Amino acid sequence: PMTSSGAIDYDAYGRLIDWQIESGVAGLVTCGTTGEASTMTAEEHRQTIAFAVKRAAGRVPVIAGTGANCTEKAVELTRFACAAGADACLVVTPYYNKATQRGLIAHYTAIADASDKPVILYNVPSRTGCNLLPETCAALAGHPRIVAVKEASGNISQIVSLFHKAEAHLDVYSGNDDQIVPILAMGGEGCISVLSNVLPKEAVRLCELFFSGDVRGAAALQCRLLPVIDALFSEVNPIPVKAALAKMGYGTDTLRLPLTPMEEGRRAVLLNALKAWGV
């Protein structure tokens, strides 16, 4: 969350962290896509990681977003996160420069070599212009500190191939809230969720239903949540989630350019969808 002047609102962020933990989430990700890391300065990025680790105080694991499109920068940030006490690092594929698959292997290997904590690969080609292929994940799975992948390609055929080629060596987490149950059904371990920012108990419940064996119940809950999920992605993430959190008392809907506040018509749809869940 940010103040109306665009400064990071650590009071609101601390309260958000506490609420997430009290709602039963299994872990926290700081400085990811939803955390607006792309518009933070290097110092803010470090401060926010350190703050999240301190605020969580060991209650749940903290995963730090440490990706960059420069390998050296990603290595430096990963080393900082490890030293600051993060439990793992979430590393998005390099964006804009569009590395080859061979380049991705070299990039992630360098980061994992520099880390003393587990590394989670993050594939979101719609945002990065770079697709981490299943065979590349399988190759990277041989590194002892590369343990999982957040899969947000949205391509179910590719995700099936990922399970076929790499599941034995990598945990797979859903990175798309509308595909949580399908990915869990293929063997996924959980989700790294945007939805959980605003409905954490429901996101936790969805996974609990699935892992308790109530697959139909989990699927039904996923379908009931779709109006909220769709509204949260009706504009580029994190624009809608920040609008929702501002309404809930966690900071303002201020974003740093080039992101701008949510269009009023879409905001109304989002807030109306949340009302159905008592928000």
Task: For each feature predicted by the language model, list its residue ranges.
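Glycine-rich phosphate-binding "P-loop"
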Residues: N123, R145-I146, R256-L257
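C-terminal alpha-helical cap/extension of soluble enzyme domains
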Residues: P1, W19, S23-V25, A185-G188, ...
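Active-site beta->alpha loop and helix N-cap motifs at the rims of alpha/beta catalytic domains
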Residues: P1-G129
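Glycine-rich, flexible loop/turn motifs
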Residues: S4, E36, S126-T128, A152, ...
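Short secondary-structure transition/capping segments
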Residues: M40-E43, V75-E76, Q101-L104, L132-P134, ...
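Catalytic alpha/beta core domains of metabolic enzymes, predominantly
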Residues: D113-A114, R127-F233
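Alpha-helical structural signal in soluble globular domains
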Residues: S23, Q47, F51-A56, F80, ...
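A general structural signal for well-ordered alpha-helical segments in protein cores
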Residues: Y13, H45, I49, A74, ...
